[in-house]
Amino acid sequence: MEYKKIIAQNKKALFNYFIEERLEAGIVLKGSEVQSLRQGKASIEESHAADTGNEVFLYNCHIAEYEKANRFNHSTRRPRKLLLHKKEINKIIGRTKIKGYTLVALSMYFNKKNKIKIELGIAKGKKLHDKRESIKEKDWKRDQSRLIRQK
């Protein structure tokens, strides 16, 4: 089992999308952003990634300002470049060109070498009836575990 110290998770992504494939990417950050992430002050709830030319950027990821960085602080929602291999970038570009597919941030974490990584998912949006179905499944599993505990 590999070591992951999770900084932020996007739990809504699993509810709103069918995750078809997962990728790990590095992320280009400034010093004040790294310090803020070490304190756990990040949110990737509404973040997504998109390609611009031959690069992939993470948009709408909120990393809070670091209090001690004063005038050298960063912008909280700036686009951040993701570090991927050329083959992975080409795969992402090909899959996101298909209608209905998007690239969603699933989690942000420190790996065992203490580098900040982001887990991306190539995802297809769920329809309303799919969301209702997943709610029913979750409720049924919860009820099953309650019944087992009572016996």
From Swiss-Prot:
Source organism of this protein record: Rickettsia bellii (strain OSU 85-389)
Protein name, as recorded: SsrA-binding protein
Domain of life of the organism encoding this protein: Bacteria
Function: Required for rescue of stalled ribosomes mediated by trans-translation. Binds to transfer-messenger RNA (tmRNA), required for stable association of tmRNA with ribosomes. tmRNA and SmpB together mimic tRNA shape, replacing the anticodon stem-loop with SmpB. tmRNA is encoded by the ssrA gene; the 2 termini fold to resemble tRNA(Ala) and it encodes a 'tag peptide', a short internal open reading frame. During trans-translation Ala-aminoacylated tmRNA acts like a tRNA, entering the A-site of stalled ribosomes, displacing the stalled mRNA.
Gene it is expressed from: smpB
Keyword vocabulary terms for this entry: Cytoplasm, RNA-binding
GO CC terms in record: cytosol
PANTHER family the record matches: SSRA-BINDING PROTEIN, TMRNA-BINDING COMPONENT OF TRANS-TRANSLATION TAGGING COMPLEX
PROSITE patterns in the cross-refs: SSRP (PS01317)
GO biological process: trans-translation
